[in-house]
Amino acid sequence: MGIVVIGDVFIDIKGYSLSPYIPQGRNAGTVIQIHGGVARNVAENIANIELKPTFISAVDNNAMGDDVIEKLKRHKVETKYMKKVENGMGTWLAVFDHEGDVVASISKRPDHRPIERILEECGDEIFQNADSVVIEID
């Protein structure tokens, strides 16, 4: 099985102001949305160097959750232990000023109970062939 990675998936929503940021005003800029979460990033990067990680996590039971799983599969991350549940992934909303510094952020944390259930139900199977385990749960 190789490397087991356990942790969260986040969706990062990042807004970049094109001019000096005005906290109480309207700010023109760009907004991007990307898959994030430290553990998800680690699993994808391990796969990018062809080490075949298994990712233990949860995603929301919607199209965004499906998209996260499909992207991980395209990178050759084993996703069979990922669960689709309500509040399965977090969201990080960050606002950056025109110089690239974070000026505001809000974070919605995911529910970790689905990961606990995966480990209770499948832990022996998951860890029996693991060479290494990476755990990151914020």
Residue ranges and their predicted role:
Residues 134-138:
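Catalytic beta/alpha-barrel core
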Residues 1-56, 63-67, 73-74:
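Glycine-rich phosphate/adenosyl-contacting loop at the front of the ribokinase-like
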Residues 3, 132-133:
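Hydrophobic beta-strand segments of well-ordered beta-sheets in folded domains
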Residues 22-26, 48-132:
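Conserved N-terminal subdomain of the carbohydrate kinase-like
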